[in-house]
């Protein structure tokens, strides 16, 4: 469920900068 939400955010963001930021946060959580 959480992973689907992250992918949804990545899709909504669309920008590589936001994608990198979300990826960094996601890696920090896991």
UniProtKB/Swiss-Prot annotation:
It is found in: Secreted. GO terms for biological process: defense response to bacterium. The modification Threonine amide is found at residue 30. The keyword Secreted applies. Keywords: Amidation, Antibiotic, Antimicrobial, Disulfide bond, Secreted. One of its GO terms (cellular component) is extracellular region. Transmembrane segments: none annotated. Homodimer. Shows antibacterial activity against both Gram-positive and Gram-negative bacteria. Its antimicrobial activity is optimal at NaCl concentrations below 100 mM, suggesting that the antimicrobial actions of this peptide may take place intracellularly rather than extracellularly. Has no activity against the fungus C.albicans. Has modest hemolytic activity. This is Dicynthaurin. It comes from Halocynthia aurantium.
